[in-house]
């Protein structure tokens, strides 16, 4: 077994294929111990056969001897007819199944049977060709991992992009590009690395090397959020260009614009600038997985650093300048200061005005002089007079 093991298995979705006959295959993204990531395709019948053999190999953990000892997850048997809704509804089950497999003891999660099943096969590398009568239809899992069979509206058409320059891959999990190559984007990761496929190749590609076919602008780029989101830097970065910002590891910042190329606009006090999103993690979250991605791929290059870039569009993509970000950010923060602290200042001012009054000693009433004995005898009751007389 050695050091060869799987770190994580994620279900990307499923495909509806028509060759040799209509059937469905599930797409899994498998991350290995060397941080390489491979996409494999498996039918549900294959997964179920794998599951049955795994139970036979570990009868105690499968609960065959004592059901209370079962730790291997359950998996429903295939149906006689598997339609699209059935394929869709199984995604939640398979996601939980894979997650549980990875959490099992090492003797199961790293056994040869499991590792061999999720290795890349020759069929995984045979992508559909243009000569096929009907190409597969791809259905991707929602970002939040939730899926409902009632939400099926049709296949997800993978977006097509064009390479604006040559790109040499830096690792086995990446894909090389030549200027003019047209790729289908399977996943747009916030890090700025997109998982793409092209003919018989698949791999991660920096988004900065790709452009949409119909427009130079990225339609899915969100609007700036000057309220900001709290993040923590998990790796130091020294600015290379004037519009970037240098930060040390562990600094608290606010993200005000998340761009799909992986270079986000952040704010540190009143300073704004570009910073690689791969070096950021939401405040309060575990940074271990984020740091593993840095080791695997690193920050993607910025488009402004690409040499010999050639776009098919007449105009360049629209981008806000750092002066605009800074001006809008300062304006927003000034408005926030005026809006929020006002009631607090007014209340504190009122307390300050009232405080001296409460601290001043109140004037004490004058103590009247003690009445003389003659006055007491003259004004008191008969009972008091008798008591005084007896006392004397």
UniProtKB/Swiss-Prot annotation:
Location comes to: Cytoplasm, Cytosol; Membrane
What does the entry's domain section say? The PX domain mediates interaction with phosphatidylinositol 3,4-bisphosphate and other anionic phospholipids. In the autoinhibited, unphosphorylated state an intramolecular interaction with the C-terminal SH3 domain precludes phospholipid binding and interaction with CYBA. Phosphorylation disrupts the autoinhibited state.
Where is this chain compositionally biased, Basic and acidic residues type? 376-385
Q: Which residues form the SH3 domain?
A: 156-215, 226-285
Outline the extent of the PX domain.
Answer: 4-125
Q: Known post-translational modifications?
A: Phosphorylated by PRKCD; phosphorylation induces activation of NCF1, leading to assembly and activation of the NADPH oxidase complex.
**Entries under PANTHER family matching the protein:** NEUTROPHIL CYTOSOL FACTOR 1-RELATED, SH3 MULTIPLE DOMAIN
The protein's GO terms of the molecular function aspect are: phosphatidylinositol binding; phosphatidylinositol-3,4-bisphosphate binding; superoxide-generating NADPH oxidase activator activity
Query: What is its quaternary makeup?
Result: Component of the phagocyte NADPH oxidase complex composed of an obligatory core heterodimer formed by the membrane proteins CYBA and CYBB and the cytosolic regulatory subunits NCF1/p47-phox, NCF2/p67-phox, NCF4/p40-phox and the small GTPase RAC1 or RAC2. Part of a cytosolic complex composed at least by NCF1, NCF2 and NCF4. Interacts (via C-terminus) with NCF2 (via the C-terminal SH3 domain). Interacts with NCF4. Interacts with CYBB. Interacts (via the second SH3 domain) with CYBA; interaction is phosphorylation-dependent. Interacts with NOXA1. Interacts with ADAM15. Interacts with TRAF4.
The species this protein belongs to is Bos taurus
Q: Which UniProt keywords apply?
A: Cytoplasm, Lipid-binding, Membrane, Phosphoprotein, Repeat, SH3 domain
Q: Would the keyword Membrane turn up in this protein's UniProt record?
A: yes
Name of the gene: NCF1
Task: Report biased composition (Basic residues) as residue ranges.
Answer: 310-319
Q: Where do the segments described as Disordered lie?
A: 290-392
- Which GO terms are recorded in the biological process aspect for this UniProt protein? protein targeting to membrane; respiratory burst; superoxide anion generation
UniProt-listed SMART domains? PX, SH3
The name under which this protein is listed is Neutrophil cytosol factor 1
Modified residue annotations for Phosphoserine: 304-305, 321, 329, 348
Task: Describe the task this protein carries out.
Answer: Subunit of the phagocyte NADPH oxidase complex that mediates the transfer of electrons from cytosolic NADPH to O2 to produce the superoxide anion (O2(-)). In the activated complex, electrons are first transferred from NADPH to flavin adenine dinucleotide (FAD) and subsequently transferred via two heme molecules to molecular oxygen, producing superoxide through an outer-sphere reaction.
Output the Pfam families linked to this UniProt entry: NCF1_PBR_AIR, p47_phox_C, PX, SH3_1
Topology with regard to the membrane?
A: Peripheral membrane protein
Provide the Gene Ontology terms for cellular component.
cytoplasm; cytoplasmic side of plasma membrane; cytosol; membrane; NADPH oxidase complex
């Amino acid at each position: 077994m050695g050091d060869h093991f799987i770190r994580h298995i994620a279900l990307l979705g499923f495909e509806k294929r028509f060759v040799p006959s209509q059937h469905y295959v599930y797409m899994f993204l498998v991350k290995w111990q060397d941080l390489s990531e491979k996409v494999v395709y498996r039918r549900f019948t294959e997964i179920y056969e794998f599951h049955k053999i795994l139970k036979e190999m570990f009868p105690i953990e499968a609960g065959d001897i004592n059901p209370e000892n079962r730790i291997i997850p359950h998996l429903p048997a295939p149906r006689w007819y598997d339609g699209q809704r059935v394929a869709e509804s199984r995604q939640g089950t398979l996601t939980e199944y894979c997650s549980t497999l990875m959490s099992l003891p090492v003797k199961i999660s790293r056994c040869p049977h499991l590792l061999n099943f999720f290795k890349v096969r020759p069929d995984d590398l045979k992508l559909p060709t243009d000569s096929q009568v009907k190409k597969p239809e791809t259905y991707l899992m929602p970002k939040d991992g939730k899926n409902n069979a009632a939400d099926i509206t049709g296949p997800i058409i993978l977006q097509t992009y064009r390479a604006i320059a040559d790109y040499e891959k830096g690792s086995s999990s990446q894909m090389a590009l030549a200027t003019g190559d047209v790729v289908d984007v399977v996943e747009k990761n916030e890090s700025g690395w997109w998982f793409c496929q092209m003919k018989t190749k698949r791999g991660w590609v920096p988004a900065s090397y790709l452009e949409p076919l119909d427009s130079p602008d990225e339609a899915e780029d969100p609007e700036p959020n000057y309220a900001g989101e709290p993040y923590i830097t998990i790796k130091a970065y020294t600015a290379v260009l004037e519009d970037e910002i240098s930060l040390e590891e562990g600094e608290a910042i606010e993200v005000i614009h998340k761009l799909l190329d992986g270079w986000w606009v952040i704010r540190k006090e009143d300073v704004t600038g570009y910073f690689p999103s791969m070096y950021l993690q939401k405040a309060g979250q575990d940074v271990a997985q984020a740091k593993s991605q840095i080791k695997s791929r690193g920050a993607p290059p910025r488009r402004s650093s690409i040499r010999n870039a050639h776009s098919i569009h007449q105009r360049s993509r629209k981008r806000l300048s750092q002066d605009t970000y800074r001006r809008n950010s300062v304006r927003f923060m000034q408005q926030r200061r005026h809006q929020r602290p006002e009631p607090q200042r007014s209340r504190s001012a009122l307390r300050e005005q009232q405080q001296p009054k409460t601290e001043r000693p109140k004037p004490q009433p004058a103590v009247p002089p003690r009445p003389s004995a003659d006055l007491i005898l003259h004004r008191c009751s008969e009972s008091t007079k008798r008591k005084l007389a007896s006392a004397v």
